[in-house]
Amino acid sequence: MNTTEWHTTDERTADERTADERTADDYLERARQAGLVAEVRGHRYVADRYDDPFTDRRQILVEYCDPGLPADAAALGALRDQLREHHATAEAVLLRVTGGAALPAPWRPRLTYICHEPSAGTTPSHTRPAVSVRPATPDDDALVHDWLVQAFRNAYPGQEVDAHHSGIEAVVANPGRLSFIAQVAGVPIGHGTVLADERDEVTGEAFAELVDILIDDAEHRREATSALVDAAARATAGRRLCGHVVHPHEPGQARQADVVLQTLLSADWSVDHAFWESTW
């Protein structure tokens, strides 16, 4: 099915479709013009090559698929076969799945995007907090850079991540970056870094991405994390605040990532979408 045919079977006018639907239409039209739209068992998808910037691993990124594809086991298998046939040099496929749906083996989660939804009526604590949070200044750039390096190394265990990797430097230099410093008794113990002017390529939605929170002080980690999230939410009020959890391949670290995710989901976060990975 091509995109033009799909448009003509929808009898609603452009004004009657929701903003999200119109944005998806626009995205699919751009993808069609680029030759990236394909179909498997009646489900459309958009796929292109994507090399991991930190490992150079050759992958195929399925940035969009019709909502019914992830729930269709036969379509998932056919998708892998189809992509392998057309991209023989790739090692894996990454599939974007909206919401918290879980895919069957051999798929495994690689990156889960979550959005902050603060609970209404939260009772403030009357105890004096040990942790204070302040906006970072240029004098803090070296500290923030070091914490970001550690965060990327944590995301790629066993991989040599250069301290001056372009991906890290891009975060530091991003004009929309807002960093916050958590401190105890005036001593910095960690940071939270937000990119305030991001946009979802598929939905077109503007959002703020909480790129990293890293706390060196285990004793104050929970309090500092909460305070940094609050600071990021206040600074980006008016647009969704999203973060992510990386799921490493190593089983022990993967289990720990799942514990972190479930802890977040039991608090003020919900799954927006996830990237699931399958090797050939």
Task: Give the ranges of each region predicted by the language model.
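Conserved acetyl-CoA pyrophosphate-binding loop and the N-cap/start of the following alpha-helix
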Residues: 74-78, 219-231
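A conserved beta-strand-loop-helix scaffold within acyl/acetyltransferase catalytic domains
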Residues: 49-51, 159-184, 190-206, 213
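Hydrophobic adenine-recognition pocket in adenosine-nucleotide-binding enzymes
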Residues: 136, 213-215
